Amino acid sequence: MEEYQGYFELDGYQQHDFLYPLIFREYIYALAHDHGLNRSVLLDNVGYDNKSSLLIIKRLISRMYQQNHLIISANDSNQNKFFGYNKNLYSQIISEGFAVIVEIPFSLRSVSSLETTETEIVKSYNLRSLHSLFPFLEDKFPHLNYVSDVLIPYPIHLEILVQTLRYWVKDPSSLHLLRLFLHEYYNYNWNSLITPNKFIKSNPRLFLLLYNSHVCEYESIFLFLRNQSSHLRLTSYGIFFEQIHFYEKIKYPVENDFTVAILWFFKDPFMHYVRYQGKSILASKDTPLLMNKWKYYLVNLWQCHSYVWSQPGRIYINQLSKHSLYFLGYFSSMRPNLSVVRSQMLENSFIMDNAMKKLDTLVPIIPLIVSLAKVKFCNALGHPISKSTWADSSDFDIIDRFVRICRNISHYYSGSSRKKSLYRIKYILRLSCVKTLARKHKSTVRTFLKRFGSKLLEEFFTEEEQIRSLIFPRASYTLNKFYRGRIWYFDIFYINDLVNHE
């Protein structure tokens, strides 16, 4: 972001907290479609001149201000859907460009909070991966006893999102334009605003930014109290959260003695907090009484500070040893790992049973088969079938599509402690690919496998399997058992549609 700061001309705008003029900048909308911010060629080949695009943007914004949002019929909602990705394209482009502009204050603060050392940058990049959470769970969860899976509530009114964002973006004009976007979308379906699977196709960049700012608002307070009350300070969260006007938002001043009492009341050095998608996990080594205190504290924080409604009865507290947690596409549970140690002292020998808890991560085979059945790779029982819609493609395209899906699933579930379910999913995809090719060539599966079986199956090998076969062509049982262990990758930043069963 630092290299684009001069290009954005942010010094003048940031000095007065005025971002609204950036809406009329041509390169903003080019960057909105270039999500990586890396390809400078796109900035030069936009396709239309600055004057025409500036007039279009001015007209659309004026039309938005002139609309009467109180009188909208059902027919108008179908014909003039504001955020439809196939209808009213220019309005969607404005909303995408607006999302890029609102992200600027967040990006500048995150860049300034990072240290200039290369190790810190690499560490922060690795923490973006979804798999970075699992080594943390492997390290911490065996020492904990209770876990609570919490569904993060969303605000009941759109103005709460605007007020939350007001502490980051102090530009009234931009906030007024944001209100127009939100109220226009609210007339169609407010529930789909927070549900990722429903609004992800409309404008995910804007609404994910709003949702993350809403969650970050209450987490900044929650983690502030957590750090103050713990003997083990969580310094790693400093680059992700900021305490935004914490004491200014409290209507009445709080006495220092009372604050210390509250912090002592929640003191627990073994409390851990993890957030993923729209849920969060609270895990502790202490008794269920302390977990209940944290549960009601969270509910009061949501209701009194963030003005969102949450029911304490929906937050369940479970024992890790008896409860399986569905977490980012894995079924995670604590499995006792028994080991027998024989020790001998002079003439006496002793046999001791040593039981250690270990995090067990399993592939959810039934939800995965349901997902494969929906996209016609298999039937409801998990038997592979041909993909009829791909039969008209070339052989290379058919194999390439199946191989990419198979490798993505293998890559994501490489951390599974038991590979049997993963092998079954790969078998379904391989046989579905063979049946699709056999259907295209009007042949049987057996005949097709006799001709191209060995070469075809080699395409489905992952990179790890190929390297292992080259290094250890005749690996022993011990080596095969070793390489069947869990592997976590730090280059996974999103969940595949087949993996996401939420």
From Swiss-Prot:
Query: Which Pfam families does the entry mention?
Result: Intron_maturas2, MatK_N
Keyword Chloroplast (UniProt): yes
Q: Which GO terms describe its molecular function?
A: RNA binding
Any single GO CC term annotated in Swiss-Prot or TrEMBL for this entry: chloroplast
Where it mainly occurs, coarsely classed, is plastid
Keyword hit for Membrane: no
**Keywords tagged on the record:** Chloroplast, mRNA processing, Plastid, RNA-binding, tRNA processing
Q: Which domain of life is it from?
A: Eukaryota
- One of this protein's GO BP terms? RNA splicing
Task: Write out the annotated subcellular location.
Answer: Plastid, Chloroplast
What family name appears in the similarity comment?
A: Belongs to the intron maturase 2 family. MatK subfamily.
Q: What does this protein do?
A: Usually encoded in the trnK tRNA gene intron. Probably assists in splicing its own and other chloroplast group II introns.
Name it: Maturase K
Q: Which organism is it from?
A: Spiraea cantoniensis (Reeve's meadowsweet)
Species classification: Eukaryota, Viridiplantae, Streptophyta, Embryophyta, Tracheophyta
